[in-house]
């Protein structure tokens, strides 16, 4: 008798994706982040569902309802902090996952990569709207500042902003629609992640060497299931430590002050995972220019397959490209730091230089280094 997992219509899909999937024998721990992102998404959907049971999306009661969750709901504080810090873990895994893709040339799977870029935008939109929901000072002013950026779009900008707001300022209508979108988007993300996997399994996984691994495949289970479980345990331990020991470490104290349209906080800044993009936005004195730079700072990832000039796929055997890659990582840390600083000297000039370096590395220096390495191969 044939095994049920190979004949049952539903089990067959699970089997070909997670059990009998042929995987390269040499993929490292950098390939763990896909499964970790799946775990993060499931965690966010579950904790979010329980939070939504107690949350009210009304400007008068939103802040109080979050306080009520933390004080009165059984383990409400745990659910709330798991959700808030789960978002941080989600972004850490996302950045590492994208970084792995850049380093090992995974962007050469174009469909998978482009769905991934789309997923990144969707997760960023979801996180932004989620940050607005507690209706603290930073929620309100963050929503005001970021939505206002759309007014930089010529001709239709102002109308577009008022349409998104549902009025002439960020108010009840804005909060209600943000809650609705924040609830639905994770399910769209889950569907997109399914498409992401579908395209990945059309080609098979990349591996650290960047060479074809068709001659040396091993089944996903038990080798990589056990490896993913180890990664999951590390993720859960890190998240638990953060939630139970310092749940507010990555948050903003201003968000414990109820939203007040008459009082602007001294430093308006988003959550830490948006700071690099926020620094790029602020480094350009022109509003439209800043918005374009902000969007392009993420959209530039979609250009990666076209900017690949090397004869080798992976950076594993390309020392010059490796140096530039780690310079890019250092530059992103610098941008993240600058995004959290006030707009004053010397932070302005550091931010501008870091922004120029960011685009220069991706658009010019890395493709040029690859061409140089191609010539070194002839020696």
UniProtKB/Swiss-Prot annotation:
Short name of any one Pfam family annotated for the protein: Cytochrome_B
Binding sites annotated in the UniProt record for a ubiquinone: 201
Protein name: Cytochrome b
Transmembrane segments: 33-53, 77-98, 113-133, 178-198, 226-246, 288-308, 320-340, 347-367
One term of GO molecular function: metal ion binding
Residue positions binding heme b b562: 83, 182
GO biological processes: mitochondrial electron transport, ubiquinol to cytochrome c
């Amino acid at each position: 008798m044939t095994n049920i997992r190979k004949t049952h219509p539903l089990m067959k899909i699970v089997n070909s994706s997670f059990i009998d999937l042929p995987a390269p024998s040499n993929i490292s721990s950098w390939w763990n982040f896909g499964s970790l992102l799946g775990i993060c998404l499931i965690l966010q959907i579950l904790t979010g569902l329980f939070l939504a049971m107690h949350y009210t999306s009304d400007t008068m009661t939103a802040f109080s309802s979050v306080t009520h969750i933390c004080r009165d709901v059984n383990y409400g504080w745990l659910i709330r902090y798991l959700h808030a810090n789960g978002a941080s873990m989600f972004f850490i895994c996302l950045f590492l996952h994208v970084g792995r893709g850049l380093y090992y040339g995974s962007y050469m799977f174009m469909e998978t990569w482009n769905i991934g870029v789309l997923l990144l935008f969707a997760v960023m939109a979801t996180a932004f709207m989620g940050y607005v929901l507690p209706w603290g000072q930073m929620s309100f002013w963050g929503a005001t500042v970021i939505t206002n950026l759309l007014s930089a779009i010529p001709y239709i900008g102002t109308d577009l902003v008022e349409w998104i707001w549902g009025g002439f300022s960020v108010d009840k209508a804005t909060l209600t629609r943000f809650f609705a979108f924040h609830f639905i988007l994770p399910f769209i993300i889950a569907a997109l992640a399914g498409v992401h996997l579908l395209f990945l399994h059309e080609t098979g996984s990349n591996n650290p060497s960047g060479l074809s691994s068709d001659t040396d495949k091993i089944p996903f289970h038990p080798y990589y299931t056990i490896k993913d479980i180890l990664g999951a345990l590390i993720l859960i331990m890190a998240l638990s430590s953060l939630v139970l020991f310092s749940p507010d470490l990555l948050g903003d104290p201003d968000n414990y002050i109820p939203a007040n349209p008459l009082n602007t906080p001294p430093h308006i800044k988003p959550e830490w995972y948006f700071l690099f993009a926020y620094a790029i936005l602020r480094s350009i004195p022109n509003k439209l220019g800043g918005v374009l730079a902000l969007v392009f700072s993420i959209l530039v990832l979609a250009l990666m397959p076209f900017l690949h000039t090397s004869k080798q796929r992976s950076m594993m055997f390309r020392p010059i490209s490796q140096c530039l890659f780690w310079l890019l990582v250092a530059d992103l840390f610098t941008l993240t730091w600058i995004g959290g600083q006030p707009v004053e000297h010397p932070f302005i000039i550091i931010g501008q230089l870091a922004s120029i370096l960011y685009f220069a590395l991706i658009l010019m220096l890395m493709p040029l280094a690859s061409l140089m390495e191609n010539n070194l191969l002839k020696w």
